[in-house]
Amino acid sequence: MAKKSAENGIYSVSGDEKKGPLIVSGPDGAPSKGDGPAGLGAPSSRLAVPPRETWTRQMDFIMSCVGFAVGLGNVWRFPYLCYKNGGGVFLIPYVLIALVGGIPIFFLEISLGQFMKAGSINVWNICPLFKGLGYASMVIVFYCNTYYIMVLAWGFYYLVKSFTTTLPWATCGHTWNTPDCVEIFRHEDCANASLANLTCDQLADRRSPVIEFWENKVLRLSTGLEVPGALNWEVTLCLLACWVLVYFCVWKGVKSTGKIVYFTATFPYVVLVVLLVRGVLLPGALDGIIYYLKPDWSKLGSPQVWIDAGTQIFFSYAIGLGALTALGSYNRFNNNCYKDAIILALINSGTSFFAGFVVFSILGFMATEQGVHISKVAESGPGLAFIAYPRAVTLMPVAPLWAALFFFMLLLLGLDSQFVGVEGFITGLLDLLPASYYFRFQREISVALCCALCFVIDLSMVTDGGMYVFQLFDYYSASGTTLLWQAFWECVVVAWVYGADRFMDDIACMIGYRPCPWMKWCWSFFTPLVCMGIFIFNVVYYKPLVYNNTYVYPWWGEAMGWAFALSSMLCVPLHLLGCLLRAKGTMAERWQHLTQPIWGLHHLEYRAQDADVRGLTTLTPVSESSKVVVVESVM
């Protein structure tokens, strides 16, 4: 049993733990060996490494997870997928995949972070051979942090432009408008106009001032990826403002972040409720909601419906990015992460479903006003946020008010997802640094460098060809394919290499009881099968990226996209092969050595406290040659 001296915080080893050598990282990060207190060594007097932060209140963790996981995809992607894939029928595959895939991995990542007290890389000290999973998640979340903020920059630009008497995208006659721009939004206006051989639908879709504002003013869209053009300085300033805001949300750690999310995570719900009340009072709103929920049972047999449900679950739950692991690492060791994970998953899916009523009540009104079928106005992604909804608000009384509310909500939804993503990346990065590299203002400088690097990369997305770069990042770097690959390996490593029952015991050590066996079965069988099935389908039916159904990317652009995807997917096999080749002994000996967990000091502390109650069984060496490996994180 490990005992801790109250005077100097040094552990001693007795009982079974004396069967093998105790390996501990010293102040300089190099391992030192010992058979008791001497092996651990006294704390270095030349270092003053602060202890790892914890949330001030557990609600800080809940709100941070809500802010991170509940983002733009819940508002602009789920409602469209639900409508496209059979309305209410889509909820059947969505709920089933959430139960067998989304919730189990969501819980797995949070509990791993809480148990190991480490970010996305060092959390895999639980099975060091597969530490490539941590590097992969760092690559993915870095890509997400880089391109996701562009949506915030565009939203911020629209928000600023909303504070006018007349919305700039509501009228023609501006410098960015073409001679063909026509201000026709309502069907009766179109019917009374002289259109010279063009139908109402063609004119409204092709030459709307909303589209021209988006393409000619905001994006200044060039002819392709090979024509980057110049910087759009107005959008660049909005991008810079967003990065400065993110920096000051993250620079002081979870103590400050946990306070900010109380506003950024809750106020969007207030705006959603206000927009729903406004939307359902508009003519045609009921028709829109019916289209949203109307079941089409024939869709249930389509593989694409199940693929869309699975991809949406993994993307909206923010699985595989390492940020949930980082957030969980700041929990107290005995926090009930099982209950938290269930609550957070329900909030996430519930928000997606609720947002559908908001979106389709507005789209129903828009379709009624234009006299077209709702399929003509239903869009997903940026098309919904920056074309469909801006067009809809031009039809409402006091249009600038509703535009400002919508884009403010959009900004907040993306902001907390962005700064929590940055927090996840910074946590993993700082956990890698040995204690001897700790210096004052380490975190502040690291966050500044990360934000500055991402901003420089983002400059490629505020050029005339920037939208094509943005689509490359979105389609390849953090796609469903990469997230499914990541989730598959997470389940395999925990369930089959480390041991599902073993990890269930570890969770019991933290929360006082074993979770439902369903979680173990999912980690071991159901979730890996679901992940691999959807992954294979995505690869077999892969379609090259095409922008706006017209622009086909050049071969080198597609190669760049696959480089983004493979840069994370290859981390796992390359790290595994590298470790096995560098290790000594037979292959079985290498495997046994490299899958031996590396424990932190807090594991010994809680084993000492709870040995007579429930025990931390995974810390007990199983043979004379086994060992307990202990490291202490920098942060």
From Swiss-Prot:
Expressed in the small intestine (at protein level). Expressed in the brain, heart, skeletal muscle and kidney. Expressed in the leukocytes. Keywords: Cell membrane, Glycoprotein, Ion transport, Membrane, Phosphoprotein, Sodium, Sodium transport, Symport, Transmembrane, Transmembrane helix, Transport. It catalyses: creatine(out) + chloride(out) + 2 Na(+)(out) = creatine(in) + chloride(in) + 2 Na(+)(in). GO terms for biological process: amino acid transport; creatine transmembrane transport; embryonic brain development; neurotransmitter transport; protein catabolic process; sodium ion transmembrane transport. Glycans are attached at N192, N197, N548. It is a multi-pass membrane protein. The chain crosses the membrane at residues 61-81, 88-108, 139-159, 231-251, 270-290, 305-325, 342-362, 395-415, 445-465, 480-500, 521-541, 561-581. It holds the Pfam family SNF. It is found in: Cell membrane; Apical cell membrane. Its main location: membrane. Residues 1-47 are annotated as: Disordered. It comes from the Eukaryota. Belongs to the sodium:neurotransmitter symporter (SNF) (TC 2.A.22) family. SLC6A8 subfamily. This is Sodium- and chloride-dependent creatine transporter 1.
